[in-house]
Amino acid sequence: MEIIALGVEPRIIRKKEAAKLRKTGIVPAVIYHKGEETISVSVNEIALKKLVHSAESHIIDLKFPDGKTVRSFIKDVQFDPVTDRIIHTDFQLFSADELVEMDVPVGTTGDAVGVEKGGRIQIIKHALTLKGMPADMPDHFLIDCTNLEIGHSIHVREIPMDARPGLTIMDDPDTPVVTIVAPKKEAEPAAETAVSAS
C-alpha cells in the first residue's frame, strides 16, 4: 500500500470555528488512537479530496508544522448532504504490530459471461472492511467476475480469501458486492397511425 504525506495543522476548538475553516478551503479533522487523547487538526480540502476520492486506499503520514509525523489511515469521512463537500474527517493512528480495520476500495477483474451477453457490471458495495495487519492490507480489492451471469451477484461470503490468509472481511456475509444487470430494453417504435385522405 502506498504511503502518502499530508500536512496538518493543530486546531483549537472554538464555537463556529469549523464553519470558518471550511469557507477558506480547510477541513476540520481529528486524529485518534485507542487509549490516547484525540487530537484536533485541520487539513487542506484539495489535498484531502485527492485521497478520499482515489480508487485506492493509502497509508497516510500526517506531518505537523514542528516536523512531527504520525502514521495513519482515513477511518471516516463526513460529507455535506447538499454540496457533497468534505466537512470532517477522522484519521486513525496505528502501529505496525497491531490489527486494524480498514475500508478498501473494490474493483473487478475478468470478462464476465453476463457482460458478453449484453449485461452491465455494477459494483454495489464500493469498499470492503478488512481486518488484518497493516502490512497485509491491499490498496484495492479485485473481485473475479468471469463466471458471473446476468441477474447474478457475488456476495461477501462468496469472495475467496485463500490468497489473503492474514485478512478477514468484516462486512455482513450476505451483502451483495457486485452484480450483472440486464440490458435495458429498447423502446418499441410507436405504432404508425393511418391517416385517410379526405
UniProtKB/Swiss-Prot annotation:
List keywords of the entry alphabetically. Answer: Ribonucleoprotein, Ribosomal protein, RNA-binding, rRNA-binding
In terms of SUPFAM superfamilies, this protein maps to: Ribosomal protein L25-like
Which spans of this chain does the record mark as coiled coil?
none
Gene Ontology MF: a single term: structural constituent of ribosome
Organism domain of life: Bacteria
Instruction: Give the UniProt entry's GO cellular component terms.
Output: cytosolic large ribosomal subunit
Query: Which NCBIfam families does this entry report, sorted A to Z?
Result: bL25_bact_ctc (TIGR00731), PRK05618.3-2 (NF004136)
Q: Which HAMAP family match?
A: Ribosomal_bL25_CTC
Quaternary organization: Part of the 50S ribosomal subunit; part of the 5S rRNA/L5/L18/L25 subcomplex. Contacts the 5S rRNA. Binds to the 5S rRNA independently of L5 and L18.
Q: What does this protein do?
A: This is one of the proteins that binds to the 5S RNA in the ribosome where it forms part of the central protuberance.
State the family it belongs to: Belongs to the bacterial ribosomal protein bL25 family. CTC subfamily.
Q: What protein name does the entry list?
A: Large ribosomal subunit protein bL25
